[in-house]
């Protein structure tokens, strides 16, 4: 009787344990996106990501200054037992999970903040005056660490290698290009990037094949004339008048020279000159940005911007010097999504959130340095992760001092990035041959 009783107790304990494991997302199959989402939504897991995101948010760092953020990333990777290499592009970190051999697929998160003062009053407000995570990069880092944790839980099941790229300086600093120049993406076949979106509903993802974000460049011009008294304009050469004509003429580049079906933008956002009501200054500085989806259109805009500024200044008897600032702010190419990866993304995302929650996204004239990876990696894909919830009230836009993150989005980002990587490895196994061959190392 004692033996039988002990057996029943043991069987009951086994049943309880099995039930617990069945309800635990950690036991989700690697090829089950919905199961990985359940894992990421578990209270402890989601709370861990929220904590990471808030710590990063409290201590924002600008491009190439992300030393504390990089240290946090490395500390968490150490805790997870994930190997990494550091530094790349000053503060960047590259980690790997899996076999160490092909195929290689990458996931990327940007780490930098913005030079702006946070206006949201809450417990985890930025502690650094004049700096704020106003674009969601704190969430991106937390989600990629969440993906890392999921992948590490399944490391023995991975059929290749997932490369985790924690990148500095997306906000105008061209951090992606410097990461590439430092050799971080060799042998990688595909890379996925994600951005939280303030206008896309929570639980919804959105993207499109082909151009998804525009190429971007900046320009600055110094227009020089001859200063003097405002009451004697005939003794001066007025650079303010010249700059005004330049600005009007620049607007004709899009309205009269660009194909209406080929979206382009030229915007002058900077005008500095003069400091007194009755003085015509010696010079004026103007500056702005230009955007296009096609490389040919982008290059044409660049050429014509310089021609128009120099020529129009000359008409007003002024001289102009144009600087495209590409040494400090490299031109961002258009972000182009691989058509093949789009079909793949739709399939995997539909399994996680349902087909109705995978939506088309109109191209944006904003720019993203994720585009640089297309110069070094055969297939690239960038998508948007919804976080809008009407019950939270109005959502301030990105780059606003009132911007906030709906932290309920973090599990979706962590699980989907992990699912995209693992499924990519499964579907892109190298062909087998009769003779064993040594794997290429990353």
Curated annotation (Swiss-Prot):
Q: Which GO terms describe its cellular component?
A: endoplasmic reticulum lumen
An example of a GO molecular function for this protein is: IAA-Ala conjugate hydrolase activity
Location in the cell: Endoplasmic reticulum lumen
Q: Does the keyword Metal-binding apply?
A: no
What are the boundaries of the signal sequence? Answer: 1-27
EC number assigned by the record:
3.5.1.-
* UniProt xrefs under CDD domains: M20_IAA_Hyd
* Alphabetical UniProt keywords: Endoplasmic reticulum, Hydrolase, Signal
Broadest EC class?
hydrolase
What are its GO biological-process terms? auxin metabolic process
Q: Does the keyword Transport apply?
A: no
Query: Record's SUPFAM superfamilies?
Result: Bacterial exopeptidase dimerisation domain (SSF55031), Zn-dependent exopeptidases (SSF53187)
Name the source's superkingdom: Eukaryota
Enumerate the Pfam families for this protein: M20_dimer, Peptidase_M20
Task: Report the residue ranges where the short sequence motif Prevents secretion from ER is annotated in this entry.
Answer: 439-442
Q: What does this protein do?
A: Hydrolyzes certain amino acid conjugates of the plant growth regulator indole-3-acetic acid (IAA).
Give the similarity note. Belongs to the peptidase M20 family.
> What is the recorded name of this protein?
IAA-amino acid hydrolase ILR1-like 1
Species assigned in the record:
Oryza sativa subsp. indica (Rice)
Q: Which gene encodes it?
A: ILL1
């Amino acid at each position: 009787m004692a033996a039988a009783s002990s057996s029943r107790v043991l069987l009951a304990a086994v049943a309880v344990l099995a039930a617990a494991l069945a309800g635990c997302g950690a036991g989700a199959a690697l090829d089950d996106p919905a199961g990985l989402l359940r894992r990421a939504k578990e209270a402890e897991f989601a709370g861990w990501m929220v904590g990471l995101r808030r710590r990063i948010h409290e201590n924002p760092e600008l491009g190439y200054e992300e030393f504390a953020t990089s240290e946090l990333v490395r500390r968490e990777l150490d805790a997870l037992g994930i190997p990494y290499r550091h530094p790349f592009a000053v503060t960047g970190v590259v980690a790997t999970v899996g076999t160490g051999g092909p195929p290689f697929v990458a996931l990327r998160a940007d780490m930098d903040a913005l030079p702006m003062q946070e206006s949201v009053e809450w417990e985890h407000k930025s502690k650094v005056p004049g700096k704020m995570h106003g674009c969601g990069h704190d969430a991106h880092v937390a989600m990629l660490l969440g993906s890392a944790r999921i992948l590490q839980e399944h490391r023995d099941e991975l059929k290749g290698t997932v490369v985790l790229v924690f990148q500095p300086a997306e906000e105008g600093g061209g951090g992606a290009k410097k990461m590439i120049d430092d050799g971080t993406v060799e042998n990688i076949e595909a890379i996925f990037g994600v951005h939280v979106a303030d206008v896309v509903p929570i639980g919804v993802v959105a993207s499109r094949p082909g151009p998804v974000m525009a190429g971007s460049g900046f320009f600055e011009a110094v227009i020089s004339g001859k200063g003097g008294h405002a009451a004697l304009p005939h003794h001066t050469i007025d650079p303010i008048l010249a700059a005004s004509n330049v600005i009007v003429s620049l607007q004709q580049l899009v309205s009269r020279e660009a194909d209406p079906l080929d979206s382009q933008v030229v915007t002058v956002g900077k005008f500095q000159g003069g400091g007194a009501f009755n003085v015509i200054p010696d010079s004026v500085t103007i500056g702005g940005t230009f955007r296009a989806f096609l490389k040919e259109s982008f290059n044409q805009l660049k050429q014509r911007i310089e021609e128009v500024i120099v020529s129009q200044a000359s008409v007003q008897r002024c001289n102009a010097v144009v600087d495209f600032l590409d040494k400090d702010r490299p031109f961002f190419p258009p972000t182009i999504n691989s058509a093949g990866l789009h079909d793949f993304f739709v399939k995997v995302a539909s399994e996680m959130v349902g087909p109705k929650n995978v939506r088309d996204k109109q191209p944006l004239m904003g720019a993203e340095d994720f585009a640089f990876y297309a110069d070094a990696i055969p297939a690239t894909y960038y998508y948007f992760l919804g976080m809008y919830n009407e019950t939270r009230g109005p959502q301030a836009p990105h780059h606003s001092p009132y911007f906030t993150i709906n932290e309920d989005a973090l599990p979706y980002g962590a699980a989907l990035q992990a699912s995209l990587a693992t499924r990519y490895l499964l579907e892109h196994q190298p062909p087998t041959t009769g003779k064993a061959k040594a794997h290429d190392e990353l």
